Amino acid sequence: MTPAEKLADGIDVFIDFVGRITAWSSFALALVMGANVLMRYGFNTGSIWAQELEWHLMSPICLFGMSYALRHGEHVRVDVLYASFSQRNKDLIGIITALIAMAISVIVIDLSISYVLQSWNIGEGTANPGGISARYILKSLIPIGFALFFIQSLAEAIRCYLAWRSAG
């Protein structure tokens, strides 16, 4: 096994770990949503904090889940065309799309850092009374999520390149 393959495998193990944690966030989100519905319709009461917790849980699910989805090939692909390509062309497309994903990740990380730092500097919280006060923590997940997406895209690029090179 080459060092590049070991790196790609190590990234996969890490992303799978993150994916398992993200799955538990999904379970927590389902519980919170169920409790909110029960409180609202069963007891005619609600909690702003619990409502905000729903999207505080949804954000890491989306931001961390996109790397897990990429790892397991669950991202969107135009299979009508892709299915007819040779394996070598599929690998080439994999390399190109991984590089594009990495570039987009770098752009999002770069653009979000000042946004996150500003949020931390002002101690940004919710405008809703009784809501979750530490919104800056949630915003910090944006560059983290795209960093995870970057490293998983790197693993995909490595694998596609090695397959493309060996098929040539």
Show where each model-derived region lies.
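Alpha-helical transmembrane segments and membrane-interface helix-loop junctions
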Residues: M1-G168
